[in-house]
């Protein structure tokens, strides 16, 4: 198991030097953030990124992510050219020795929260999702804004894309995902790249949009789309646990049994009323996930891939990208490493 850390490039207030000082830290999870979605990442740009990371004494463990263009998700005629570009990016990453790619198939919006700075009694702040608040939000008219909404969409463009998805139900989205997988995975497999689809976050429909990578049944359906280790998942326990109907340990065990876990996101959340939840500190006592059992499963199944502490609280007066500060994620990384050491030594 390789401890890794998300880094958002030169614009990230958390530096590679900061990250390299975290005990047990080996890898960086990053991407090229200024190439428009759908265009090819050149080998030159990948080399530049790799050299920068390695100069700090680290390595690129995972690319998170190579975004999937909306036209692919919608099944538009332009998808074939866009998939060709995606395949070329996968090949270019493989040529530079990068073998794991995280991606998602969420329509329009990435991870969704209703507050980026919910304040706990101790003064720390965290990301939360309030189901009641989310139902009042209108992505088209913008009466309420949502953290993570893509500012690159004008109101007219947002309306157009939301209207387009009105014609896409869950089965149609599965059909479009299947088309993508059947084109991508053979090419990824041929160059030794493991793809790792991230679950929908949260793992249920919002704003009437279909969401399909949501739980155990979805994972079992997904892995059958193409029988290859290259067609794997990102086991994001915090995302799966955000649906109170999901048993995240059952999901984790089954995913490992299927040998499709290519990347692990380890963060904790505290379930609230209905489908509301708050992100918490990583230790089990603060959330609804038994992190010790998650790490035990990683060891039991011999997981050797990258794991990273996911979103953290903002603590000790830190400011920066919500969920992606240094301090709480560093605490999370050392906590996870401590659990891993305890599991290994306790199993002897």
Swiss-Prot record:
Its EC number is 4.2.1.8. It is an enzyme of class 4 (lyase). Signal peptide: none annotated. Transmembrane segments: none annotated. GO terms for molecular function: ferrous iron binding; manganese ion binding; mannonate dehydratase activity. InterPro entries: Man_deHydtase, Xyl_isomerase-like_sf. It catalyses: D-mannonate = 2-dehydro-3-deoxy-D-gluconate + H2O. Its cofactor is Fe(2+); Mn(2+). Gene3D superfamilies: Divalent-metal-dependent TIM barrel enzymes. It holds the Pfam family UxuA. Pathway: Carbohydrate metabolism; pentose and glucuronate interconversion. Keywords: Iron, Lyase, Manganese. GO terms for biological process: D-glucuronate catabolic process. Catalyzes the dehydration of D-mannonate. PANTHER family: MANNONATE DEHYDRATASE (PTHR30387:SF2). Belongs to the mannonate dehydratase family. This is Mannonate dehydratase. It comes from Streptococcus agalactiae serotype III (strain NEM316). The gene is uxuA.
């Amino acid at each position: 198991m390789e401890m890794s850390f998300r880094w958002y490039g030169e614009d990230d207030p958390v530096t590679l030097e900061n990250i390299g000082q975290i005990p047990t830290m080996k890898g960086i999870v990053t991407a090229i953030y200024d190439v428009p979605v759908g265009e090819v990442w050149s080998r030159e740009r990948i080399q530049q990124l790799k050299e920068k990371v390695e100069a700090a004494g680290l390595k690129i463990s995972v690319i998170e992510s190579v975004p999937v263009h909306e036209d692919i998700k919608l099944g538009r005629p332009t998808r074939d050219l866009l998939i060709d570009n995606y395949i070329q990016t996968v090949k270019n990453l493989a040529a530079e020795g990068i073998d794991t790619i995280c991606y998602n198939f969420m329509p329009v919006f990435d991870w969704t929260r209703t507050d980026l700075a919910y304040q706990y009694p101790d003064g720390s702040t965290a990301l939360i999702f309030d189901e009641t608040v989310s139902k009042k939000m209108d992505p088209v008219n913008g009466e309420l804004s949502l953290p993570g909404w893509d500012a690159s969409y004008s109101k007219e463009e947002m309306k157009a894309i939301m209207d387009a998805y009105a014609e896409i139900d869950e089965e149609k989205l599965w059909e479009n995902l299947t088309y993508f997988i059947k084109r991508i995975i053979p090419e990824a497999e041929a160059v030794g790249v493991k793809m790792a689809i991230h679950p929908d976050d949260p793992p249920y429909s919002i704003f009437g949009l279909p969401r399909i990578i949501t739980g155990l049944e979805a994972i079992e359906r997904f892995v059958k789309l193409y029988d290859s280790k290259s067609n794997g998942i990102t086991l994001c326990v915090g995302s799966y646990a955000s649906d109170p109907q999901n048993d995240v340990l059952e999901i984790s065990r089954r995913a490992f049994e299927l040998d499709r876990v290519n990347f692990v996101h380890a963060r904790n959340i505290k379930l609230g009323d209905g489908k509301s939840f708050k992100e918490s500190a990583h230790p089990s006592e603060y959330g609804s996930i038994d992190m010790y059992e998650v790490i035990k499963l990683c060891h039991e199944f011999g997981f050797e891939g990258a794991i990273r502490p996911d979103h953290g609280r903002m603590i000790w007066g830190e400011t920066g990208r919500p969920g992606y500060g240094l301090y709480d994620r560093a605490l999370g990384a050392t906590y996870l490493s401590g659990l891993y050491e305890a599991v290994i030594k306790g199993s002897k």
